Regions:
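Short loop-to-helix capping motifs
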Residues: 39, 147-150, 192-193, 363-366, ...
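Regular secondary-structure segments
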Residues: 24, 28-31, 99, 103, ...
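Amphipathic alpha-helical repeat elements characteristic of tetratricopeptide repeat
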Residues: 17, 21, 92, 96, ...
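C-terminal all-alpha effector/ligand-binding and dimerization domain
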Residues: 168-232, 237, 384-440
């Protein structure tokens, strides 16, 4: 195995930026698709190492505009209306977590940068200048670019790239009436109140509804089984077992070829497994070697914030429209979680998270489903032992969820989502306080 031939476990590492820009330019200046893309030929033409080109392809695969077929060939195509609809929703789902994570970390320098971006966006919006869409995007992306939550930052920047490059030419932001968004985010910054940040995220959700109508991208209502996503395979499970058991020691480094020998799998399978472990926060890479990371409370906390965004999306866009067997199943799950909490049953952790899992699995949004699976896996493996959920007094949450289910009432669903955010933050505070007694 040639060192670096398969690319990095993190294709979004800065070292791959040049190859990404070249590959993106190549596909966007060619036919709309679907068209094949010869990565080896392009790498030779550009004089770029094979691993860099593959990493660039993996980025475009993450965005959904490049796909790999069973025969190993790569194909480019624009996002469908349904996938673009999902993309808009997923970015909005991350706005709340980004605001809640970034506002407490603002320095005077960052405040000044934010003020400059907001002033530029306000001015260009009022004057209807052609640079307004770019200025507005810069003001919004501030919250992701400077977020201390590395997971939300990474997913948010990728989601923005997906919106940006989904179509040729790029579909521009179309809503000029954005005063309420900037006023609410300003109030969130001044007050430091997470509830105001949540309210700002709800304003952005409303702006995107207007944008959808303006550009003709209706909301997706496809069934959950109409989406496609990669699931972890046996090689990933094998390496996860070795990391969790200590067979692969924390801090140890390994070459790809050594892991190929260890697992008996192909380099491509091992590399895919390493990408998954990297996404879980368990593996880092550099110079062709892979390092087993240290489980951390920071990784767990970041993931809980992501979970609030995923849950909010499910509550608002799935819960009001539940019908038939799905509605019955959801109410059964809520009743079980409520009952387990009332008697402080040890099953409460699983029954509570089953409610979250159900909402996102009911969504036909592929990006939300993938983020949910990522969040649940990180919560399970970010710490040496997954912490118990001990928010016993969550009666108001369960009752509001039950009331919102199948009601057709989005406002009741939003109220349930806000209660979930509060309960999740209390869970984070509880686990943070207990961390010193939870083992190494």
């Amino acid at each position: 195995v040639v060192v670096g031939e398969w690319g990095d476990a993190d294709p979004w590492a800065a070292a791959n930026d040049d190859a990404y820009a070249s590959l993106l330019a190549h596909v966007r200046t060619g036919p709309r698709g679907p068209v094949p893309v010869d990565l080896d030929a392009l790498g030779w033409e550009w004089g770029t190492p094979r691993g860099r080109v593959r990493a660039a392809a993996a980025r475009l695969e993450d965005l959904g505009i490049l796909s790999r077929r069973p025969d190993g060939s790569w194909w480019y195509d624009e996002l469908s209306d349904a996938d673009l609809s999902d993309t808009l929703d997923f970015w909005v789902a991350l706005v709340g977590p980004a605001l809640r994570a970034t506002i407490p970390a603002l320095t005077p320098e960052l405040r000044a940068e934010l003020d400059r971006r907001v002033a530029r966006a306000r001015t260009t919006a009022a004057l209807r200048l052609p640079e307004y869409p770019t200025a507005f995007s810069a003001a919004c992306q501030f919250w992701f670019e400077h977020s201390p939550n590395t997971l939300v930052r990474s997913l948010g920047l990728r989601a923005f790239e997906r919106m940006r490059w989904a179509r040729v030419p790029t579909q521009l932001w179309s809503v000029h009436e954005v005063h309420t968004w900037f006023a609410t985010t300003s109030r969130a910054v001044e007050s430091g109140d997470p509830a105001v940040a949540t309210a700002a995220a709800e304003v952005m959700d409303g702006l995107f509804e207007v944008h959808r109508r303006n550009v003709g991208i209706p909301r997706t209502h496809r069934p959950a089984d109409d989406t496609t996503e990669d699931r972890v395979g046996p090689v990933g499970r094998t390496l996860l077992r070795d990391v969790r058991s200590g067979a692969l020691v924390v801090g140890s480094t390994h070459r790809l070829e050594d892991l190929v020998t260890r697992t008996g799998a192909t380099p491509e399978q091992v590399h895919g497994a390493l990408r998954w472990l990297h996404d879980l926060g368990l593996v880092d890479d550099g110079d062709g070697r892979y390092r087993v990371g240290q489980p951390s409370l920071a990784t767990w906390r970041d993931t809980m914030e992501l979970l609030t965004g995923v849950f909010t999306h499910g509550a608002v866009h799935v819960l009001p429209g539940l019908r038939g067997p799905a509605l019955e199943e959801f109410r059964m799950l809520v009743a079980r979680a409520r009952a387990d909490g009332q008697v402080r049953d040890h099953r409460y952790t699983e029954s509570s998270f089953a409610v979250t899992r159900f909402l996102s699995e009911q969504s036909g949004n592929r990006w939300v489903r993938e983020a949910l699976r990522l969040a649940m896996a990180r919560l399970a493996y970010a710490l040496p032992e997954a912490p118990a959920f001990r928010q016993w007094d969550a009666e108001a949450l369960w009752l509001t969820l039950d009331a919102a289910a199948g009601s057709g009432d989005v406002e009741t669903a939003r109220a349930a989502a806000r209660r979930f955010v509060d309960v999740a933050r209390a869970h984070v505070d509880d686990v943070t306080a207990r961390w010193g007694t939870m083992g190494s």
